[in-house]
């Protein structure tokens, strides 16, 4: 299992387009990916769940991946969020 914290940098937060990109990235990997905000976990491959986070600029979220390609999944998710 790999787990990292990430501070949202996008001015508009994790809104529809970046959330969609985030989910598409998570779907590319076999690992189970979860995103947490305020201790509550959401399936990273579900656009509805990611939008439910309500993550805005400055929020710190936690990314967790578990499986055979967990490190690659985390790296790709961070890269996707950075492009936001």
Predicted region positions:
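Compact, glycine-rich, soluble single-domain proteins
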Residues: 7-53, 57
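C-terminal structural segments of small proteins and small subunits
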Residues: 51-84
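Intrinsic-disorder/low-complexity, polar/charged segments enriched in Ser/Thr/Lys/Arg/Asp/Glu/Gln
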Residues: 1-5, 60-62
